[in-house]
Amino acid sequence: MKNITFIFFILLASPLYANGDRLYRADSRPPDEIKRSGGLMPRGHNEYFDRGTQMNINLYDHARGTQTGFVRYDDGYVSTSLSLRSAHLAGQSILSGYSTYYIYVIATAPNMFNVNDVLGVYSPHPYEQEVSALGGIPYSQIYGWYRVNFGVIDERLHRNREYRDRYYRNLNIAPAEDGYRLAGFPPDHQAWREEPWIHHAPQGCGNSSRTITGDTCNEETQNLSTIYLREYQSKVKRQIFSDYQSEVDIYNRIRDEL
């Protein structure tokens, strides 16, 4: 057992300890609470339903956070890490007041953006190796979790019985090109006049002209992000319906053969 533990923490200490189709998030909430919430939802999700506050789905605002370093109250993204090690370091920093917390293992999907790839040199915290999930992470997308007690990660990965591999199999995070127009830089930010963002600037951003409706740069970014999120959600729903229909067809075929 000592040898197994030793090997586990050697792997944990390596920056390469990452799975290409898995992401990680440290969170103080236990799995049953996450399940009741429907998954790992952005803070702005609750604000929207409780107070009618519009979610801010601006990646640059999300990455910067607030001036005090905390998550924005209207944030429309959920932060994850590329590696277990990065998530553990984040947990030890922001959850140091908890004797027990969890690191959730999450399947990748196209509503997720590598912050450093999208924001490039303007990424405010590049060392965090963050991948942000637009609109949150459903419970069915959570592969499992590790329990962390007094800073030590439990060796056992607890599998989520409600994880649906067939929904997320072969899905990857969004390519950086999909995220450039959703970057969310302020209207006059120099990034909109530089490569690669200059070719993806929404109307009203940088040197791009205003929209016909007169929307500002921020409003246009919000609109584009909303459209992107809805298209992704529709894709997942179609996949769920397709799988359900396939199961019904199989059931009917077996019934007819009996």
From Swiss-Prot:
GO terms for molecular function: toxin activity. Heterohexamer of one A chain and of five B chains. This is Heat-labile enterotoxin A chain. The gene is eltA. It holds the Pfam family Enterotoxin_a. The active site is at E130. It comes from Escherichia coli. Changing E130K: In inactive mutant. NAD(+) binds at residues 25-39. Changing S132 to E/K: Abolishes toxicity. Changing E130S: Abolishes toxicity. InterPro entries: Enterotoxin_A. Residues 1-18 form the signal peptide. Changing S81K: Abolishes toxicity. Keywords: Disulfide bond, Enterotoxin, Signal, Toxin, Virulence. The biological activity of the toxin is produced by the A chain, which activates intracellular adenyl cyclase. Disulfide bonds join C205-C217. Belongs to the enterotoxin A family. Changing H125E: Strongly reduces toxicity. GO terms for cellular component: extracellular space.
